[in-house]
Amino acid sequence: MNTPPETRPDRPIRSQYEDFMRHVDAHGVFKADRTGTGTKSVFGYQMRFDLNEGFPLVTTKKVHLKSIVQELLWFLTGSSDNNWLKERGVTIWDEWAREDGDLGPVYGVQWRSWPTPDGGHIDQISEVIKTLKTNPDSRRIIVSAWNVADLSKMALMPCHAFFQFYVAPATEAGGKGKLSCQLYQRSADIFLGVPFNIGSYALLTHMVAQQCDLDVGDFIWTGGDCHIYSNHAEQVALQLSRAPFPYPTLHIKRKPESIFDYQFDDFEFLDYQHHAAIKAPVAV
């Protein structure tokens, strides 16, 4: 896998995300796809973001923070109802929702209510919090949204399918461990989807770290089929013509009683400097 240079405070600002986009634009091969749009694609890529160096929001275009935060909170409710999002002014799932708003057993359902053969359910998020608090050295701190038995019932199969947490021990007496998260994304729409996914899982890592009394470490994004849609070529060229700004800083205003009690207003993104938004069609 190709890992671009990390952004460091003592170096000129160079965004891993834009390097990723350049790599796919230069080396991608044409592939047909499910939507009939066509893509320029590479297989396998990785980016590593040190969350202590800022919150990794894309700055070469405006990212819709409200949608990122509300979607993550929606996942954590365990809901499959798009109406929850629409009531909060978020429309990113509208293209896939059924008439009544249902999306089938998508991300939140699998995270919170993975079905078991005996008719029960597993709350994977609660298990993660419990394990991080009681056995942080475990190599099994994993959440999967890729439930093969349920795929045909989903309005959209999971693109970001599987993530794992890792705790690096404290380096000094009385210090805190550092929580890192690695996401595997089987299908990555680089222009529209990946900026959301990076922001969402970076935010989740901060939330889980706060709940488990840990410091944040790295967020590692790993992609499978990484692609630029053919009808995003002009938008990509425009975005790559822009110079990135420094990352903003995330401030979480309070510590709720549980991972499920955060509200939208709990999060503040300080000094988010960005270029103008760039519109592009969604491949459905």
Curated annotation (Swiss-Prot):
Q: Where in the cell is it found?
A: Cytoplasm
EC number(s) given by UniProt: 2.1.1.45
UniProt-annotated binding residues for (6R)-5,10-methylene-5,6,7,8-tetrahydrofolate: H64, D189, A283
- Which keywords does UniProt give here? Cytoplasm, Methyltransferase, Nucleotide biosynthesis, Transferase
- UniProt GO BP: dTMP biosynthetic process; dTTP biosynthetic process; methylation
Principal subcellular localization: cytoplasm
Pathway involvement of the protein, from the record? Pyrimidine metabolism; dTTP biosynthesis
Q: Does the keyword Cytoplasm apply?
A: yes
Does this entry carry the keyword NAD? no
GO molecular function annotation: thymidylate synthase activity
Identify this protein by name. Thymidylate synthase
Query: Which organism is this protein's natural source?
Result: Polaromonas sp. (strain JS666 / ATCC BAA-500)
